[in-house]
Regions:
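Active-site neighborhoods and metal-handling regions in enzymes and metal-associated proteins
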Residues: 1-262
């Protein structure tokens, strides 16, 4: 069932979205060689709790951390570890969720650790740009397939592949709600977008094959050919007679990264 949010609900959803955005901005300060992914997780959890919120991901279906941290060929759902140390040339996707006042926020950003190859940087830029292509289609009266089509076409035209098994989703009192928001689609297909819908759009785009494999831990999803993947995500609200409202933000990341912001 698709739940339409009221204006009162959106007040709380904005707050949760901004907590997530600021948590990612806090993490951005520590994205550098020598830092463990477990430390990044601790930093984010401390910030989220300092806001009177709780991490959405911690213990969600048994997930053992507050962040999903996915390094290089890991597409999504990487588990932070004290043994996993960032090094020059890595790319690291940080996916963050926070729950406050009964509503979730959800966002992800893929960071560069130092300098990366030009082809990897281009993958990150294209993936982020495709997120905004999807958001541009998130208009009242459009359909979910219009979002997926926009993301898919933008990335495939540039030679990248789109992960199909992992999708965006509705967001609200539950972290994952209807409808699913695939990153592929046909124009004019799928559920119709209505004012009050709140959804997370999250392109997961690969440099090589679109095929993925699940690790034995039951969480970590990698590219089958071990080439890099990128992941960017915003939570947005469908508004009446206008464009979508982005409830999360990359502004705090940009403040930290400056000219290294993608």
């Amino acid at each position: 069932m698709i739940y339409l949010k009221t204006e009162d609900d959106l007040v709380y959803l904005r707050e949760s979205g901004q907590i997530v955005a600021k948590a990612l901005g806090t993490v951005a300060e520590f994205i550098k060689p020598g830092i463990t992914t477990k430390y990044l997780d601790q930093i984010a959890e401390e910030y989220i709790r300092s806001c009177g919120a709780v991490p959405s991901f911690l213990n969600y279906s048994g997930f053992p951390a507050s962040l999903c941290i996915s390094l290089n060929d890991v597409v999504v759902h990487g588990i932070p570890s004290k043994d996993q140390v960032l090094k020059e040339g890595d790319v690291v996707s940080v996916d963050c969720g926070a729950l406050k006042n009964g509503f979730h926020g959800d966002s992800a950003y893929t960071f560069r650790v130092g300098d990366v190859s030009k082809e990897t940087e281009a993958l990150l830029r294209t993936t982020k740009e495709s997120l905004y292509q999807g958001i541009a289609q998130s208009l009242e009266g459009k359909r979910v397939g219009d979002i997926g089509y926009a993301v898919q076409e933008y990335c495939q035209r540039r030679g990248y592949t789109v992960v199909r098994e992992m999708v965006g989703h509705g967001v609200g009192r539950n972290l994952h709600e209807d409808p699913e928001i695939p990153n592929v689609g046909k124009r004019g297909s799928g559920p119709q977008l209505k004012a009050g819908m709140v959804i997370a759009i999250e392109p997961m785009i690969n440099l090589g094959t679109r095929n993925i494999v699940m690790e034995r831990d039951g969480w970590t999803v990698r590219t089958a050919d071990h080439k890099p993947s990128a992941h960017f995500e915003h939570t947005i609200a469908i508004r009446k007679n206008g464009g979508a409202e982005i409830l999360t933000s990359f502004d705090y990341i940009q403040e930290v990264l400056g000219d290294r912001f993608i």
